[in-house]
């Protein structure tokens, strides 16, 4: 019989080891590392289950709500994504799916520790918001309705009425029905905890600037506010009251020919260092000069500035870390950025609207600007850019100098008939070899931009990339097969406008060992999709959206029907086939 003292000692050692593992586990935040740790043994699995505080689900159909709550009963933060990313570009049917209702039900019933909820590209009803508000009440600290739809201001009123201690409320780029402005008034009257309020890029028209001023006065911890198109002079009282504000985005500056200096006396909070003013023109730009040296983030996506205006402003922002703008910045603007902003970490350059006068050569981004940027801003970690011209040399420069780059996205516009240097095979190889920290990679070109050899380079030299978007790359199925022999850690693959057959796509999927999600639009589609069944396996859902004609408004305001090519969406799911597919989605279950 075992000695009682020895038995007690063994039990004590086990308990001590468990305590140590539990303490260590709290410092493991990368989901992939967490997953690996949980597979060591049953004890580690249980500790991970009990201590995991945050989960992000890249697609809400990959597991059932009750399975998630059983696996991680003590979650404090949950992020759910619904519609595929392509929905942001109007490529996915509005009724595709992504309903939050089953998740809200589970949160209300079983996830009692949850304090932060983030829904992205999902359909949210007023009933969902009301149930969430009543279930979590003052325990809910963060609610993000990120690019969501389906609710009204009644749902928001329920949230702010029942969740009086909410710290973050976000509705950026969401679409909804506005009945009144009671929700903001209620928030202003009864909340003293708010830190972040964001309804940027929304169409609220019935809310009062006075309520924003009251919020600023009552919530001393308010550090970030992003709003819609308020006339900026209506926010003078808000700016005066928001003593601790660090970030502001939105508003509206409207040039008045009869009053050229009407904004010159506008005073911003002294701690403001992240800023974006909608419709700011060159005449209003000087209001930023007094505190430009302290600006860390600048959003110029909706400013009305030309290339030289960018140059003038950027020179005055030597501590800039984040810049978002449009390609009107031009090569000249990027050269100034490279010269003056050595601490830049994130750069996003979107495509400018055609009506903004892009015919001016100054308003174009090309290899010249990219080379200057790579040499001058070597702290860059994120770079997303639309270019009008490109060379292999510019990509090689990025690989040579930007060693901290984790996320790189490049789109080659189709406005120029001739591109200086195609294909980009050698350039992309040099970039991927040099940027060893890359985790996210998007390369969206045009026909002839990348050969099969270049596509094989992407597979060979992307050992750590987890998400990838490829557009108009490769020449044949063989290129895709060579690509699929690499990318050992690729989890999400999106492709558009490629020449691959269904058979090649299915074969490539089976060779990518870590792949969990696939979206393809614009491939050699068949009538039946039968060849896609070669990638069928347990827990792997395959959905098709057949080609369809969709009404779109062109630049002249005319409504015309556009042809949308067929889509493939395939993903791992422990929940099986979803039950809410609309008629526009066809589920592949077995060979036809």
Swiss-Prot record:
LRR repeats lie at residues 58-82, 83-102, 103-120, 121-154, 155-182, 183-210, 211-236, 237-264, 265-283, 284-308, 309-332, 333-368, 369-393, 394-426, 427-456, 457-478, 479-500, 501-524. The keyword Repeat applies. Keywords: Jasmonic acid signaling pathway, Leucine-rich repeat, Plant defense, Repeat, Ubl conjugation pathway. Pathway: Protein modification; protein ubiquitination. Residues 16-57 form the F-box domain. Changing residue 85 to A: Loss of interaction with TIFY10A. GO terms for cellular component: SCF ubiquitin ligase complex. Required for jasmonate-regulated plant fertility and defense processes, and for coronatine and/or other elicitors perceptions/responses. Seems to not be required for meiosis. Required for the regulation of some genes induced by wounding, but not for all. Component of SCF(COI1) E3 ubiquitin ligase complexes, which may mediate the ubiquitination and subsequent proteasomal degradation of target proteins (probably including the ribulose bisphosphate carboxylase small chain 1B RBCS-1B and the histone deacetylase HDA6). Component of SCF(COI1) E3 ubiquitin ligase complexes at least composed of ASK1 or ASK2, CUL1, RBX1A or RBX1B and COI1. Interacts with ASK1 and ASK2, but separately. Also binds to ASK11 and ASK12. Interacts with RBCS-1B and HDA6. SCF complexes interact with the COP9 signalosome (CSN). Interacts with TIFY10A. The F-box domain is essential for the formation of SFC(COI1) complexes. The Leu-rich domain is involved in the interactions with RBCS-1B and RPD3B. This is Coronatine-insensitive protein 1. The lineage of its organism: Eukaryota, Viridiplantae, Streptophyta, Embryophyta, Tracheophyta.
């Amino acid at each position: 019989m075992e000695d009682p003292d020895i038995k007690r000692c063994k039990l004590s050692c086990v308990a001590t080891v468990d305590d140590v593992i539990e303490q260590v586990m709290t410092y493991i935040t990368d989901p992939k590392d967490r997953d690996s740790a949980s597979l060591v043994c049953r004890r580690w699995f249980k500790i991970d289950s009990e201590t995991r505080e945050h989960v992000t689900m890249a697609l809400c159909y990959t597991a059932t709500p009750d399975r998630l709550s059983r696996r991680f009963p003590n979650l404090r933060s949950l992020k759910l994504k619904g519609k595929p990313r392509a929905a942001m570009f109007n490529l996915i049917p509005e009724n595709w799916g992504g309903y939050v209702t089953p998740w809200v039900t589970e949160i209300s019933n079983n996830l009692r520790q949850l304090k932060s909820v983030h829904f992205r590209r999902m359909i949210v009803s007023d009933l969902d918001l009301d149930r969430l508000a009543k279930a979590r009440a003052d325990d809910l600290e963060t609610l993000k309705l990120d690019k969501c739809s389906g609710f009204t201001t009644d749902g928001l009123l329920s949230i702010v009425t029942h969740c009086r201690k909410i710290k973050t409320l976000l509705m950026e780029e969401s679409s909804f029905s506005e009945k009144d402005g009671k929700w903001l008034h209620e928030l202003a009257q009864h909340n003293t905890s708010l830190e972040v309020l964001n309804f940027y890029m929304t169409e609220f028209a019935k809310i009062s600037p006075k309520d924003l001023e009251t919020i600023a006065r009552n919530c001393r911890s308010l550090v970030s506010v992003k709003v819609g198109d308020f006339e900026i002079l209506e926010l003078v009282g808000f700016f005066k009251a928001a003593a601790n504000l660090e970030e502001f985005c939105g508003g509206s500056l409207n040039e008045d020919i009869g009053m050229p200096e009407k904004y010159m006396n506008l005073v911003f909070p002294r701690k403001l260092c992240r800023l974006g003013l909608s419709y700011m023109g060159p005449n209003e730009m000087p209001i930023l000069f007094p505190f430009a040296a302290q600006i860390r983030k600048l959003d110029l996506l909706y400013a009305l500035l030309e290339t030289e205006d960018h140059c003038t402003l950027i020179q005055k922002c030597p501590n800039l870390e984040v810049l978002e703008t449009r390609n009107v910045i031009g090569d000249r603007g990027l050269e100034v950025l490279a010269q003056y902003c050595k601490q830049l970490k994130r750069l996003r350059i979107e495509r400018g609207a055609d009506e903004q006068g892009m015919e001016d050569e100054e308003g174009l981004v090309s290899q010249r600007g990219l080379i200057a940027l790579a040499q001058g801003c070597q702290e860059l970690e994120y770079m997303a850019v639309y270019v009008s011209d490109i060379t292999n040399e510019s990509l090689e420069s990025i690989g040579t100098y930007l060693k901290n780059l984790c996320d790189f996205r490049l789109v080659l516009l189709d406005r120029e008939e001739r591109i200086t240097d195609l294909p980009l095979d050698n350039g992309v190889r040099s970039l991927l070899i040099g940027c060893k920290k890359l985790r996210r990679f998007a390369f969206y070109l045009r026909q002839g931009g990348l050969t099969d050899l270049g596509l094989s380079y992407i597979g060979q030299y992307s050992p750590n990339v987890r998400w990838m978007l490829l557009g108009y790359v490769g020449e044949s199925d063989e290129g895709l097969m060579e690509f699929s022999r690499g990318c050992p850690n690729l989890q999400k693959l999106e492709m558009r406008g490629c020449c691959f057959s269904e058979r090649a796509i299915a074969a490539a999927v089976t060779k990518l060992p870590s792949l969990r999600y696939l979206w393809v639009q614009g491939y050699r589609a068949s009538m039946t999709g039968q060849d896609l069944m070669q990638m069928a396996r347990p827990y792997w859902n395959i959905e098709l959206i057949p080609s369809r004609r969709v009404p779109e408004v062109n630049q002249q305001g005319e409504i015309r029907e556009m042809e949308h090519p067929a889509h493939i969406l395939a993903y791992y799911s422990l929940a099986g086939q979803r039950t809410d597919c609309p008629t526009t989605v066809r589920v592949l279950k077995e060979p036809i």
